[in-house]
Curated annotation (Swiss-Prot):
GO terms for molecular function: rRNA binding; structural constituent of ribosome. The gene is rps5. Residues 61-124 form the S5 DRBM domain. The keyword Amino-acid biosynthesis does not apply. It comes from Pyrococcus abyssi (strain GE5 / Orsay). This is Small ribosomal subunit protein uS5.
Length: 236
């Protein structure tokens, strides 16, 4: 964590009045590593938790607006127009979140989407599962995973170093925020539906956590959970 983001986390910590048990644990310094939250199965309900433990997701390059749509709903008083925004955030090193926000103004909808993405942040497994590579570096997925949303199916397949991201643009943005650099993919369904495609990619990344790995697999594929190089979370 750079000094700039440590200072940002300190400011959030000083001004923040937590409303949940997890928030209090973070505020009191009893939890100082985001990995501990996922290891213990806590649910994140306050975006400030991410602002303190993973402040670098607030950098402009670590936030992506994936889709902006105008929705119209008929009410007794007439047509009601609102914006719907799909956003993703990540630290480019094992953590990524996806969120949808609504609002009468696009700026409000964007802020809501980013906050929801923070609340939905997940920790993923990375590694080198490609038989063409075997470098044991966390540049790809360690094994094939599949995600589904609506009619869309996305399969992420380990790729060798230097391959890049062989997937649609929305998928590329999410994978980069997660810290995935090389991957093959297979897609089925109406992938032009941005929301479903993004959620399917996100679900595939989440499913890396459902595979039970052995010490032999960790050694063979260089599997890491979350950050590849744990940062210092001391805010002193």
């Amino acid at each position: 964590m750079s000094q700039e983001w440590k200072e940002y986390a300190k400011r959030v910590l000083d001004e923040w009045q937590p409303k949940t048990k997890l928030g209090m644990l973070v505020k009191e310094g009893q939890i100082t590593d985001i990995h501990e939250i996922f290891r213990k199965g806590y649910q994140i309900k306050e975006p400030e938790i991410i602002d303190v433990l993973l402040p670098e997701v607030n950098a402009r390059e670590n936030q992506e607006i994936l889709d902006i749509a105008l929705t119209v709903r008929m009410t007794d008083s007439g047509r009601r127009v609102r914006f719907r925004v799909l956003a993703a955030v990540g630290n480019r090193d094992g953590y990524v979140g996806l969120g949808i926000g609504h609002g009468r103004e696009v700026g409000i909808a964007i802020r809501k989407a980013i906050n929801y993405a923070k609340l939905n942040i997940i920790e993923i497994k990375r590694g080198c599962g490609s038989w063409e590579c075997r470098c044991r570096r966390p540049h790809s997925v360690p094994f094939t995973v599949e995600g589904k949303e609506g009619s869309v199916r996305v399969k992420l397949i380990p790729g060798p170093r230097g391959l890049g991201l062989v997937i649609g643009d929305v998928g590329k943005k999410i994978l980069r925020l997660a810290g995935i650099q090389d991957v093959w993919s297979q897609t089925l369904g109406e992938t032009r539906t941005t929301v479903n495609f993004a959620k399917a990619v996100f679900n595939a990344l989440y499913n890396t956590n459902k595979v039970v790995v052995t010490p032999e697999m960790i050694e063979r594929y260089g599997i890491v959970v979350g950050r590849a190089m744990p940062a210092s979370f001391t805010l002193e």
